[in-house]
Regions:
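N-terminal periplasmic/intermembrane-space "pro-region" immediately following the signal or transit peptide
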Residues: 1-6, 10-49, 92, 323
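Outer-membrane beta-barrel pore domains
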Residues: 36, 45-53, 71, 88-96, ...
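Short, acidic Gly/Pro/Ser/Thr-rich loop/turn segments
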Residues: 2, 161, 173, 305
Length: 323
């Protein structure tokens, strides 16, 4: 009976979101023309990577997307990914994996918006940024990857002033066909622009067994860009806290051609272990051939462990083509 009530409440919630965002059509006014022709896009990121005592060429990402508008207030996006890094060998003779990343319908009306399907959850600033626009080849250790899940998200925007986002998702991650524990995960994020060029905000995530909080800021002025985040997560079952932060600065040396990047990051996976903290120091360069559509990104990161040093310094040279 409880499961049935949850199902009914979710259905009613989705209906209310759609009904709220769907504008009532005036009786004698025709809707503005909107192209419903699907648009095809994607990007490739082949790279050379030297990590510790191993070196290899690999395909970091290969993503292909189809997106389009259904009417003036509804659109969709479908994106799939082929990759070799960290992919399970299926079949065993091939290290290439295929999976879906974005699978959603987006609704918008004025300052309000909603997303239904599989999308990036509103939490970390760096995880919400596309890998095609990042200044570095890899996200920081505490962020690691863009979090995606299946559910519904609502947002409200005051242009150049405020962004408020909230989401309810299964909490099982992307490409999951069920929610075994029947418990939802909840996300909330607020971003404010007190002065031009400066965005500051915070976010919260709540799972059935863990919670997390994020403080974030980004500043852009002239040729300079600065971005920083602090994340703290708590696993209630083990009572372990994980913390991490990063601070990044980028300077455009030659407009539309060369950008220098530096980053310091730190990650402590457990406050129960006194010797597991790791600090990383990165220097890098972006060379733009045609903006983010065609560029080379090279960076080198030195990691320093709290006690025992490990051979895990990382050098990456990656080419990106986006269309």
């Amino acid at each position: 009976m409880r499961s049935s009530r949850r199902s009914v409440s979710r259905t009613v919630g989705l209906w209310l979101v759609t009904a709220t965002l769907a504008p009532a059509a005036p009786a004698q006014t025709s809707a503005p023309a909107v192209s419903t022709t699907p648009r095809v896009g994607g990007y490739l990121q082949p790279r050379f990577q030297d990590f510790g005592d191993s070196a290899t060429f690999l395909l970091r990402r290969a993503r292909f997307a189809i997106e389009g508008s259904i009417n003036p207030w509804a659109s969709y996006r479908v994106q799939v990914e082929m990759r070799t890094l960290g992919a399970p060998a299926v079949p065993a003779s091939s290290p290439l994996s295929l999976s879906a990343t974005d699978l959603y319908i987006k609704l918008s009306q004025g300052a309000w918006g909603a997303t239904v399907g599989q999308f990036r959850v509103p939490f970390s600033l760096e995880s919400l940024l596309s890998s095609t626009t990042l200044e570095t080849n890899e996200r920081s250790r505490i962020v690691n990857a863009a979090k995606r899940d299946i559910g519904v998200q609502a947002e409200w925007r005051w242009p150049d002033r405020v962004v408020l986002q909230g989401a309810v998702v299964n909490g099982e991650g992307p490409n999951r066909g069920s929610n075994p524990d029947n418990r939802m995960a909840y996300f909330a994020r607020a971003l404010f622009t007190p002065i031009k060029g400066l965005d500051v905000g915070g976010a919260f995530e709540g799972y059935s067994d863990s919670t997390g909080a994020d403080a974030q800021a980004v500043y852009r002025r002239g040729r300079w860009t600065g971005r920083a985040e602090y994340i703290r997560e708590h696993n209630r079952r083990s009572d372990v806290h994980a913390t991490g932060w990063y601070a990044l600065a980028a300077y455009t040396l030659l407009p539309e051609r060369v950008q220098l990047v530096g980053r310091v990051e730190q990650f402590d996976p457990s406050d129960r272990v006194a010797t597991d903290r790791e600090t990383g120091y990165l220097v890098g360069l972006q060379y733009f051939i045609r903006g983010d559509a065609f560029k080379l990104v090279a960076d080198y990161e030195v990691f320093r462990e709290q006690v025992v040093q490990v051979t895990n310094n990382r050098a990456i040279v990656q080419m990106q083509v986006r269309w």
